[in-house]
Amino acid sequence: MYIFIKGEVLFGEKYMKKIITLSFCFMFIVLFEQSEAQSTDDVTFDVIGVQLYNEFIPCVGGPDFNQENVDKMMKGWRALNISDDLLGAWGYVPATDTSRFDNGWWELSWESKEAADAAWAQWVQDEEAMAFLAENESVMVCNGEERASWDFTFHRDVYSFGPMSEDGSFFTEFFPCKYNAGKSSDDLMKSIALYNKWLDGLDATSFYAYGIYAGDGTDELADFWWGNFHENSDGAAAGQASWLETGGEARASLEATATCGVPEVYNSGVIYDPSVPEFSKS
């Protein structure tokens, strides 16, 4: 999001562990991209307004952490008994040395909390999976017990500004946001409508998509996170400049609705996508 930034908002205390920075970079394929034969209209229908249950898991790189070992581990992980209810999984790597967090993240996407909880219950009882994770602790460890969950929704066609770059790379900004006094998700939806109208007027062809990670009201530091997905960091900078210059009514509405902290920025990529052979179960 091209949004007004005021102050600084942090994640919850349990996510402030100082752990080794992940440095891998996976290829990114949008979660709902089904195949080259599927039309953009199909993708749009599948994505817009669909509420998903997404989880973020903090991960630590070990002494044997390198690209070759990570690739091997990911291939092995996709060969395990992964739940059919898992819609997708992504890796996030801090893009700057000034990130609040030294750790990387896995994001898992599900249709519901019930589906996620059922899959986790089966996963921790899977002896083959537990043995695999133990064997790869020197490469990477992800702490499932520390996962955080959010209701995620796309509010615009992810391809409205064109396709991803050919190599699949993209750049992510996560803005932690707190509703201003008297404001709520209803006000945010009105602001989003104005934001989409503003986006419609842009003369831009660089890939850009965004989504909202809504909290359950129990986090004192962030009511929701706004996720920006750009083609690259240059695209993010250009978008921010355009927003500050021409945001107008949409910008005023968003700033009146919520105050958002300095974003966390990441190089990101797919770990699992059941619709893409290279990243599906093997």
Question: Predicted segments — roles?
Answer:
Residues 1-15:
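Short, Lys/Arg-enriched N-terminal segments with co-localized hydrophobic residues
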Residues 11-13, 22-23, 254:
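Composition-driven detection of intrinsically disordered, low-complexity segments
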Residues 15-17, 282:
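Universal eukaryotic N-terminal targeting presequences
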Residues 19-29:
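Sec-dependent N-terminal signal peptides
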Residues 29-35:
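C-terminal segment of classical bacterial N-terminal signal peptides
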Residues 36-134, 138-282:
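Short S/T/G/P-rich N-terminal loop/turn motif that feeds into the first structured element of a domain
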